[in-house]
C-alpha cells in the first residue's frame, strides 16, 4: 500500500465534514499535517464515541469507498476502542479511545485547525505515542519531541 497522502487527507476531511462526523487526525498522520517531515501508510483518526457520530462515520466511510462488513459497521457505530480498515482506497485506523488521552472533548478543546483539518495538538499526539509504548512509537518519539520544539516556535498563532 502506498503512503497516505495529502489528497487522501482532503477526501477524508470532505466526506467526514459532509456527514458531520466529529473526529481529529491523530498519530503520525496528524503530526504530518502539522508539518512533521515523515510518511505514513494510513490515516489515524480519533473519533468522538457517540452512536450518532459512529453511524455518520459509517456513511462517510462507505461514501469514500470502504467496503465495510456488518461487523465492522457495528464496531464503528458502537465505538469499539480500535478499528483497523484495510478494505478501502487507503488504510485507516479508527481510534475511539487512544492511549494517553482522557476524553475526546479534552482533545477537541486543544485541537489545531490547519487548512481545515482538525488535528490533535502535538502534545496529545506525543502523549498517545508515549502511553502506547510500541516499539515503532518509541523510535519516532525523539524526532517528534524535537519537531515539537520547532513547531511551538514557528506555528502560526
Enumerate the language-model features and the residues they cover:
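Compositionally biased terminal segments of proteins
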Residues: 1-157
Amino acid at each position: 500500500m502506498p503512503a497516505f497522502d495529502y489528497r487522501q487527507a482532503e477526501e477524508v476531511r470532505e466526506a467526514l465534514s459532509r456527514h458531520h462526523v466529529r473526529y481529529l487526525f491523530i498519530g503520525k498522520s496528524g503530526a504530518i499535517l502539522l508539518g512533521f517531515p515523515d510518511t505514513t501508510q494510513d490515516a489515524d483518526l480519533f473519533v468522538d464515541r457517540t452512536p450518532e457520530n459512529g453511524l455518520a462515520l459509517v456513511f462517510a466511510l462507505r461514501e469514500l469507498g470502504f467496503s465495510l462488513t456488518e461487523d465492522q459497521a457495528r464496531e464503528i457505530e458502537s465505538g469499539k476502542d480500535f478499528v483497523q480498515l484495510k478494505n478501502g482506497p487507503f488504510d485507516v485506523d479508527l481510534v475511539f479511545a487512544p492511549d494517553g488521552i482522557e476524553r475526546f472533548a479534552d482533545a477537541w478543546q486543544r485541537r489545531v485547525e490547519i487548512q481545515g483539518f482538525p488535528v490533535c495538538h502535538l502534545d496529545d499526539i506525543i502523549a498517545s505515542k508515549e502511553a502506547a509504548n510500541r516499539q515503532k512509537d518509541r523510535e519516532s518519539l525523539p524526532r517528534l519531541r524535537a519537531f515539537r520544539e520547532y513547531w511551538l516556535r514557528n506555528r502560526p498563532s
